[in-house]
UniProtKB/Swiss-Prot annotation:
Entry function: Component of the coat protein complex II (COPII) which promotes the formation of transport vesicles from the endoplasmic reticulum (ER). The coat has two main functions, the physical deformation of the endoplasmic reticulum membrane into vesicles and the selection of cargo molecules for their transport to the Golgi complex. Plays a central role in cargo selection within the COPII complex and together with SEC24B may have a different specificity compared to SEC24C and SEC24D. May package preferentially cargos with cytoplasmic DxE or LxxLE motifs and may also recognize conformational epitopes.
Protein known as: Protein transport protein Sec24A
Biased composition (Polar residues): 112-126, 138-168, 299-328
Gelsolin-like repeats: 966-1038
Keyword Protein transport: yes
Alphabetic keyword roster: Cytoplasm, Cytoplasmic vesicle, Endoplasmic reticulum, ER-Golgi transport, Membrane, Metal-binding, Protein transport, Transport, Zinc
MF terms (GO), sorted A to Z: SNARE binding; zinc ion binding
GN (gene name): SEC24A
Length: 1093
């Protein structure tokens, strides 16, 4: 964003500061971005169906609860920063800098009262209904009219206006990164063992072909001549600005280079980009891709477009070489209905959930495959990286409203990949209108022209792009890696950078108060740092520093010329200053011995301290001042509630009411940590918080420092090196991953979509720097994001839509890189097709994000009611609009057969459960995880996997690196699946629980647990002995394999029948009734009663 006192690109300082959370002069409340959307829910009247009641039905169904609109607005973005929408304010010319560009102003959305498309929403559902005031509820489709932060305004996919914006690519490794603990996406078929040393991704260098070049060699590189007109004014370069970097430099018509001064301009294609001249003929063929084999007769149901895809008379382009022929992918390559595909029969089934019980598959649930031609689908993005809640996009907003399902994307953009194509080229080909990166779903009209699949502009193919470095053939632009891979990484040239890449900087901030010393965490952390010091991502420029604090702040001089570390104490916490800053952040290679000495002595330096106060706020201020010039990663370790100086907090939790549905302490008690996080984001500093506390520490307030700076939160309740050794093991394992995993610095991310679609709300840890540009001072491979979308214009003229995320970052090696993911989905016109393409896991994940926001802006009970109403609304819509005959029971499409189960699991998840057995910090941490975890981990935490493991066999096992990994079937989460003569393993994501029945076989007890009888099982038991038996080898291999697939370390608890941990085990039996929640069958009866009203 802009520096203090400097207006951001294209806007007045006041409005910008308001958006980013700075208090306005008028005294308006401090807010951080778009205001929470109203939960779009149209309570469409549902026809009175046959109210079928089964014997034994739940006698007192829950009445449907209508939420009251919530007045006012939250000053904060919620626990994770509410997913918010942001309307674009009119863009004012910069009064200081003369406008360098001109162009038509973007179309602004009308106020809710004037915009016929924006319908007010009732508070307890997702769908539009007339004559109701817009409450503070979830909203699928439309942005709200105010603004808050951590979730962004809508990013319209209108042909965005030039703004010549190419991502400034932060350079990342040419390799795909460090070996990952997680398995990469593997297509169906035999499992592929993970590589111990993943191969480096291929680097394509047009200037250095793999073999002898074709006759005559490749042509000389011709400089691109992008347009320079842009709607927004360009201020002077802001070299420390994080937001101003998603962009490309452009050549003016006379060939001179103009370096843009903001990320938004470099990356380009944002809301304020300028539309280019495009063909306005609505009948113009919007073909996608390049020549594909002809389809079977069943697919050829429409007339294909013309050979060129664009009427020559309407576009006066030179014909260019005519030898290149390409049949564009037209309507004959896409069926108009799901019935055209040879889907599995169950895809079209209607399921009565009250009669069919075993709907949970015995293998991990796979995402639905979009209804696309196989030649398009094989190029599509891996769903682990990029997936949509609806794999068939509704043609209109009205159709989406009628389906009453959320439309959104879930992303894991920086995931560790075994193979990642990396392109090194002086020319990065992008659409000159919307700045989309060329991708597999564009159309080549001929050898010299390609049509953008997002805004449909026809662009010229640069000369260099005609040469294919893989085949060493000239004249094959459609075979280049950029159009053969939906996920690709570009090495960005220097003109993509606003300032030279900064060195990797790692600053560690340790709490050394008496409480911290008692936990013994310093021993574990310092030892982990010593063990992994050489594995920190970076190069010869890597810098490191340390700060400790109690009631004072301690700095450590580590300059190479010193014989031992020098401790500098600052006792004035009211006005913190940095003593000898040049000695505090030092080159790791040059001062490694001093760093090692400090890490060895630090745990003993404060063993006799009696200081109980904690000045966390002043310590964070000092750390921020130290890191501001370069940016980097700040790792903060805290063990108690801050009690001294700025940011001091007071206990707010009442034990007897700590988890009630009307909890009022889920929002921050101060805006200090949020304001500081915004300052950190502006200087490219991300803050990761490690909270190791058995007492209430107000994570709702402390978590803001990570949420808005794109950091992460780690929570270790009741950490103690002697009393809770299993937490020590967990901290060490997770620190090893944290310290050695890949990292990107100075990152920004933008998501684009096809014209007609609009992105209006973002979820995750970041800060929205401009209307659709996410600022990520650090990006890590374990973070996930979500966005909500609406259909802004009818999609009747297109059969395919595309989504593209572009992540610009600097690698730890100092390379600027752009990682691009592109997803292509079909457009459908019938409600049945929308339901058939529903992705129930993605829908559940997006609803969980929305429910966290609702908890913050309204209340926990409102969030729970909205989750239930999401199921009622969608199944009511299916019953009334799709089913031809009203049958008794609870009829659902096969794609949504698990929707009620997953929503019930969310209601019983720690984030949203009622009762008083969850501490407030634990609930807040669970909500942090919902907002920051990739979908695969979120679903595992929400709906654990249950396996029977006392009879493991090699049948159907995976063979990975000489290991045999058993694959037992997944069981339903109900006690009726348990038996006292067996042993059952529950994988709940962050914890593994092995329940051993009282009558378990002697063979399992002796061959796996190493005990002679049931009573001999030690309590607590948190590890399995490695015995020389086949049974022991199988279960240890299986548990190790489960742990390897995630970036966090799940603790294993072996539970006897009378163990206190048994209650935790049974709490995760989602289908059974608990003291405060319905059983699955009772929940289905409640849903049925509401649907049949």
């Amino acid at each position: 964003m802009s520096q203090p006192g400097i207006p951001a690109s294209g806007g007045a300082p006041a409005s910008l500061q308001a958006q980013n959370g700075a208090a306005l002069a008028s005294g308006s409340p401090y807010t951080n971005g778009p205001v929470q959307n109203a939960l779009l829910s149209s309570q469409e009247s549902v026809s009175q169906g046959y109210n079928f009641q089964l014997p034994g039905s739940y006698p007192h169904p829950i009445p449907a609860k209508t939420l009251n609109p919530v007045s006012g607005q939250s000053n904060y973005g919620g626990s994770q920063g509410s997913g918010q929408t942001l309307n674009r304010p009119p863009v004012a010319s910069n009064p200081v800098t003369p406008s360098l560009h001109s162009g038509p102003a973007p179309r602004m959305p009308l106020p809710a009262s004037q915009n016929p498309a924006t319908t007010p929403m009732p508070s307890s559902s997702f769908l539009p209904e007339a004559n109701l005031p817009p409450p503070l509820n979830w909203q699928y489709n439309y942005p709200s009219t105010a603004s808050q932060t951590n979730h962004c305004p809508r990013a319209s996919s209108q042909p965005t206006v030039s703004g010549n914006t190419s991502l400034t690519t932060n350079h990342q490794y040419v390799s795909s990164g460090y070996p990952s603990l997680q398995n990469s996406f593997i297509k169906s078929g035999p499992s592929v063992p993970p590589l111990v040393n993943p191969p480096l991704p291929t680097t394509f260098q047009p200037g250095a072909p793999h073999g002898p070049p074709p006759a005559g060699g490749p042509p000389p590189v011709r400089a691109l001549t992008p347009l320079t007109s842009s709607y927004r004014d360009v201020p002077q370069p802001l070299f420390n600005s994080a937001v101003n970097q998603e962009g490309i430099t452009s050549n003016t018509n006379n060939g001179s280079m103009v370096v843009h001064s903001s990320y938004d301009e470099i990356e380009g294609g944002g809301l304020l980009a300028t539309p280019q001249l495009t063909n306005k003929n609505p009948k113009m063929s919007r073909s996608v891709g390049y020549s594909y084999p002809s389809l079977p007769p069943g697919y050829q149901n429409t007339t294909p477009p013309g050979a060129t895809g664009v009427p020559p008379s309407s576009l006066n382009y030179p014909s260019g070489p005519q030898a290149f022929t390409q049949t564009p992918l037209g309507a004959n390559h896409l069926t108009t209905s799901m019935s055209g595909l040879s889907l599995q029969p169950e895809g079209l089934r209607v399921v009565n959930l009250l009669q069919e019980r075993n709907m949970l598959p015995s293998t991990p649930l796979k995402p639905p495959v979009p209804n696309l031609h196989e030649d398009i689908q094989k190029l599509n993005c891996n769903p682990e990286l990029f997936r949509c809640t609806l794999t068939s996009i509704p043609q209109t907003q009205a159709l989406l409203n009628k389906a009453k399902l959320p439309l959104g994307l879930l992303l894991h953009p920086f995931k560790d990949l075994v193979q990642l194509p990396v392109v090194t080229s002086s020319t990065i080909v992008r659409c000159r209108s919307c700045r989309t990166y060329i991708n597999p779903f564009v159309s080549f009209l001929d050898q010299r022209r390609w049509k953008c699949n997002l805004c449909y502009r026809v662009n010229d193919v640069p000369e260099e792009f005609l040469y294919n470095p893989l085949t060493r053939v000239y004249g094959e632009p459609h075979r280049r890696p950029e159009v053969q891979n939906a996920t690709i990484e570009f090495m960005a040239p220097s003109e993509y950078m606003l300032r030279p890449p900064q060195p990797p900087v790692y600053l560690f901030v340790f709490d050394v108060s008496h409480n911290a010393v008692e936990t013994g965490y310093l021993n574990s952390v310092c030892q982990s740092l010593l063990d992994n010091l050489d594995l920190l991502p970076g190069n010869t420029r890597t810098k490191i520093g340390f700060i400790t604090f109690d009631s004072t702040i301690h700095f450590y001089g580590l300059q190479e010329s010193l014989s031992q570390p020098q401790m500098l104490i600052v006792s004035d916490i009211e006005d913190v200053f940095i003593p000898m800053p040049e000695n505090l952040l030092v080159n790791l290679n040059e001062s490694k011995e001093l760093v090692q000495d400090l890490l060895k002595t630090l745990p003993q330096m404060f063993t006799k301290t009696l200081e109980t106060q904690s000045a966390l706020g002043p310590a964070l201020q000092a750390a921020f001042k130290l890191m501001s010039p370069t940016g980097g990663r700040m790792s903060v370790f805290q063990t108690q509630l801050p009690t001294l100086g700025v940011g001091a907090l007071k206990p707010r939790e009442e034990p007897n009411h700590r988890s009630s549905a009307k909890d009022i302490h889920m929002t921050p008690s101060t805006d200090f940590y949020k304001k500081l996080a915004l300052d950190c984001s502006g200087q490219q500093v991300a803050v990761d918080l490690f909270l190791l506390s058995g007492q209430y520490s107000d994570l709702a307030s402390l978590g803001c420092i990570s949420r808005y700076s794109a950091g992460s939160v780690y929570y270790y309740p009741s950490y103690h090196h002697q009393h809770n050794p299993v937490q020590v093991q967990k901290l060490q394992k997770e620190l090893q991953r944290y310290l050695t995993r890949k990292i990107g610095f100075e990152a920004v991310m933008r998501i684009r979509c096809t014209k007609g679609l609009s992105i209006h709300t973002f979820h995750g840890n970041f800060f929205v720097r401009s209307t659709d540009l996410l600022s990520l001072p650090n990006v890590n491979p374990d973070a996930g994001y979500a966005v909500q979308m609406s259909v802004e214009e009818s999609l009747t003229d297109t059969q395919l839509v595309s989504f593209q995320s572009a992540l610009l970052y600097t690698s730890s090696k100092g390379e600027r890189r752009i990682r691009v993911h592109t997803l292509c989905l079909p457009v459908v016109s019938t409600l049945n097709d929308v339901f058939l393409g529903a992705d129930v896991q993605a829908i559940s994940g997006l609803l969980a994000n929305m429910a966290v926001d609702r908890s913050m802006t309204a209340s926990l009970s409102d969030a729970r009611d909205a989750l239930v109403n999401a199921v009622i609304d969608s199944l009511s819509a299916y019953r009334s609009s799709v089913l031809s005959n009203q049958q008794p029971g609870l009829m659902v499409p096969f794609s949504l057969r698990l929707f009620p189960l997953f929503v019930l699991a969310l209601l019983k998840q720690k984030s949203f459960q009622t009762g008083t057995n969850a501490r407030l910090d634990e609930r807040i941490f669970a909500m942090c995880q919902v907002k920051n975890q990739p979908l695969v981990y979120l679903m595992l935490t929400t709906h654990p996997s249950l396996y029977r493991v006392d009879n493991l066999s090699d049948e159907g096992a995976l063979n990975i690196s000489d290991r045999t990994i058993p694959q037992p079937p997944i069981l339903q989460l109900s006690v009726e699946k348990l038996s006292r003569d067996g042993a059952f393993l529950m994988d709940a994501g962050s914890v593994l629980m092995l329940w051993v029945g009282k009558n378990c076989t002697q063979n399992f007890l002796s061959q796996v647990l190493g005990v002679q009888n049931y009573a001999s099982i030690p309590q607590p038991m948190t590890d399995l002995p490695e015995l020389d038996t086949p049974e022991s080898a199988r279960i240890i291999a299986f548990i190790s394999w489960l742990r390897e697939q995630r970036p966090f370390f799940p603790i294993l608890y072996v539970i006897r029948d009378e163990s206190p941990m048994k209650a935790n085990f049974l709490q995760n039996m989602i289908e059974d009734r608990t003291e405060s929640a319905l059983s699955y069958y009772e929940f289905l009866l409640h849903i049925q009663q509401q649907v049949n009203k």
